[in-house]
Amino acid sequence: MRRRPPQLTKTKLADEEVPELTLVPDGVSRWTGSDLDALLNAARRGGAEAAQQDLERKLCRTIDILGARSQQAQEINAVLTSVARLRENSTFRLYLLTQNHRGVGILKVGVKKLFVTHPVTCGLVEVDPLCVLDFYVDESCQRQGYGKMLYSHMLKAEHVSRPEVLAIDRPSNKLLGFLRKHYGLAAYTPQVNNFVVFHSFFDHTTVSERGKLLRAPSPARASPFPSSANATVAIGGAKAKNWTPG
């Protein structure tokens, strides 16, 4: 009886070398589960070029490896970013930073319904903000401005002019320090759901009779999806949206 090969653990996955993405320009590109499905379907189509098949495989491997490294760096039990998780919710967006044609950073965002404590009334209010769900830059590339490049690109692509309107899922002390240094965000009330919403998140808001937080119309309001006016780059039959050169 043949023995089944041992399952690859997240630790081993995190130790893998990130593959070279020769068809992905250096800079920031945006991917969703639907984009990855389209890339997979194109790769499986009869007559697909070997380079296209190679791109799909290496891009998915890059996402899984960086997601595993993020999990390891944060010392958490569950992986936050993987191809499988992106396919589970196609509304989530993954911003991938590549340098020298290799992935060096990821930033995952998506809209979620949350109940958070209002810092003034101390009562629970319902909100549906754009959330930062995972943020990681490879250790070998930290303190070189890549994190700011990735975060700034995401804010622009998501039409967020005020970073304080985002909710942050379980931020590490390093991420809190990053937000304090670059965006002056510091004061917040701890939430039972482990999301961080800064006190300035509640600026220019009111609470409805049903307890829903209402934000005054503003350019700072995050759109669920970037506008079609943003640049796209065709890559192997799929589109890397909102690409910004490195």
UniProtKB/Swiss-Prot annotation:
**Does the record's keyword annotation contain Transferase?**
yes
| Native source species | Leishmania major
Q: Which UniProt keywords apply?
A: Acyltransferase, Transferase
Q: What job does this protein perform? A: Specifically acetylates 'Lys-40' in alpha-tubulin on the lumenal side of microtubules. Promotes microtubule destabilization and accelerates microtubule dynamics; this activity may be independent of acetylation activity. Acetylates alpha-tubulin with a slow enzymatic rate, due to a catalytic site that is not optimized for acetyl transfer. Enters the microtubule through each end and diffuses quickly throughout the lumen of microtubules.
State the reactions this protein catalyses: L-lysyl-[alpha-tubulin] + acetyl-CoA = N(6)-acetyl-L-lysyl-[alpha-tubulin] + CoA + H(+)
- Record EC number: 2.3.1.108
Top-level taxonomic group: Eukaryota
Name used for this protein in its record? Alpha-tubulin N-acetyltransferase
